[in-house]
């Protein structure tokens, strides 16, 4: 039998086992703090709108939860992504037994979490460099007023235009943005 093969292992059971020299720091993206091991695991369980096709030459981006590559404005500052309907989260008690579909607002919330001072994310710099309008101000307000981060406050930098459409507005042109 090949190394790692379990005798009597059934095809229905799908388990991925990875060995790391240290435990992961978190499964929560804003709290991984650039932990390579945690990020390796997260890449297996979270899906971004786009993913790399590493086998293509040259390497290219392909839609993952998006239906296509984003529409990019002429000035290179606005990216509009349409999500594929019918993608559901894995069952979780948080969903109270109901199926939960992935929607654009989920990505808005996920990005905003990096700005929430409660998480003190060391990966925030990756978003700060994009200068997403409104997000730094929202963070600053939460810090200055010592109040919880306002997830309900709409900002120009990241918005759900409808159930399946996500718009990201950069504060300055960045041709590498979709490759990050």
Language model feature labels by segment:
Residues 10, 71-77, 158-165:
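Short, ordered beta-strand-loop transition motifs
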Residues 13-23, 78-81, 107, 166-168:
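Short, well-ordered beta-strand elements
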Residues 19-75:
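N-terminal lobe/hinge region of extracytoplasmic solute-binding protein
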Residues 101-180:
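Surface-exposed binding/hinge segments that line
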